[in-house]
Amino acid sequence: IMDNAAVRRGKPSVYAKWGPSVAILSGDAMMICAYRLLSEVPAELLPRILGTFNTMALEVCEGQQYDMDFESKRKVSVVEYMHMIELKTSVLLAGSVTIGAMLGGASEEDCRKLRRFAIELGLAFQLQDDLLDSYGDDRLGKAIGGDILEGKQTYLMITAMSRADEATREALRTTRLDARLSDAEKIAAVKAVYDRLE
């Protein structure tokens, strides 16, 4: 809903198919289903698992807020970006893995190691997603250039901004807003800068 995405992982989004009201209610219903499942956790594990779940949910919200804030921020560092994607993407995977490990009887040390692995895997996933947005194949279900047109601060954009001279940085900031250019021309112009600054 927040990014008006018509497609998610190659399928029509709930938002695009049924509108924002159904999408919001669907999200609420999924959260309630999650808590229903959590209520079935053995009593001795419930505090740890519920704490892990709630922390994960709050961190995902925090990461999403950073992502939206970054769209209007003039300069975002790679460190800030990596923190944002850890919160927005990695902690969901890490929380899920950690809860599974707890339910499976894993030691604290093993839970910690699995969490760290999942964090790194989530970072790799998001960085790959950034690359696919600009250089992927739209037959795989991700429209090419969506992040560019939305003004998203991706790893590619942040790196290009850090390597570019001021005139090129200004062009990167404003190309997506140029009404004289088609979306395809805007995407091509930004990708040309990415390629040049590689």
Regions found by a protein language model. Name each.
Residues 1-198:
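All-alpha prenyltransferase/terpene-synthase fold signal
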